[in-house]
Amino acid sequence: MLVIGGLASAQSPRRGGSLRVGLSEDPPNMDPHQSVAAVDRQGFQNLYDKLVDINQDLEIVPMLATSWTISNGGRTYTFKLRPNIVFHDGTPFNAEAVRYNFERMLDRTFASPRRSEVLLVERLTIVDPLTIQIDLEKPFSPFLAVLSDRAGMMVSPAVARRLGRDFSREPVGTGPYKFVEKRPQERVVLERFDRHWDRTAGNVDRITYRTIIDEQALLANLKAGELDMINVAPPTDVPALKRDTSLKLLEREGLGYQGIWINTTGPPFNNKALRQAFNATIDRRTLVRVVFGETASPANGPFPTGLLGSDAGPNGRIPERNLDLARAKLREGGQPSGFAFTLKITPGRVQQQIAQVLQSMAVDVGIRINIEIVEFGTVLSQLNQARYEAVRLGWSGRPDPDGNLYAMAVTGGGLNYSGYSNARVDTLLDAARILTISDHRKRAYGEIITILNDDLPIIYLYWGKEYKVASLKLAGFVHIADGMMRFRHVWLNP
């Protein structure tokens, strides 16, 4: 049956039991300051606390910080921290720990993907043990939104200093669940942390995340009673799941996007005309209809419907398939008969379907796509090393548009795997971070998207809805549009 918003229950929460969660990808990294994979964040929601969080309405709400003030024209943030909090290793959480976490993310030698998210932090001042003042170089509108995700997740300074870049092997936060084990391609196990500050959190004793790459196999395991919740719904099964009274289908409009990352630094796609030729072969509406049906919509940029800037860009229009344009761009790019490239995809039936549809479209003008299936963690490593031509990936989305764009498009950004650089885009991205009036930010993002749809470091394909499927036993789950599974207050009914 279809459920919008979450799994409310008139019953009181129950303690005990083990929650079994199915993931369609294997989490490659348990360090929030090194992680780049959306699937990592599923476990992070329960292993780490953040300075702030978001609620169902995407409003910023307190977590480790109980309150904050913004002063000095938007350049100074002063956070009051929750008292009597300890990390899972027993060391205290305080203002000194917050300062260490920011310094860790900002350390050039540590090379954190979070660095571009907190780059405007100029000074960290400990006012008292439970108060920290953060001064920015200039106003930064998305700062609180940034701190509601990985940049706001606090790790144990003692363990991080001891393990360095190996922190992922023994991750320690302050969340309601602590790390037990990680077996690659198999499972991640967390268990309740009895010293957590929120005494209403941690109803279930243990959370086991099982990696099951095939979405149909995920659903089959849920139906068989081997899982209590899965992080995706196979698109073709959504209509039937809406009618199925033995399971709960949770649906929200998503915040993210799906596309193709293009390596603009090497052949063939260091040739802009060839990027444009390939893009012109894509019929996004047909792709969505064939693979996703009602569960997705064609995209023209990184901002799905409802996010600031979603109707910006090329007049809000979806790019159309244009084979005459594709052939003209092939001639301009010096490849009138077409060319070949390798599209890397992660395992899974849906990913193969997407690649095959793209392959069948591109060949109409002589563009030949070789499809290579690569394990998720490996493809992230190859992205980081620019060892690819094109990769089919997505971004799970953030509540502020800056989080969907800046790190991927700014020169030298922590997630700029395309090697893209455009001085005008850099200027506009920085300006949009400072602007506080929505219409002004929207105009800046509109120009950025227009440029990106011409330069094509990322080819935006579609925006997907956020689906989760759960057993009838699961209660207390709140479904937020960022797609993250927050289990701190859920419980299992008999």
Regions found by a protein language model. Give the residues of each.
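N-terminal lobe/hinge region of extracytoplasmic solute-binding protein
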Residues: G22-N72, Y100-E103, V172
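Structural transition elements
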Residues: S297-E332, V350-Q353
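Extracytoplasmic/peripheral linker and loop segments enriched in polar/acidic and small residues
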Residues: P319, R368-V379, N384, Y406-L472, ...
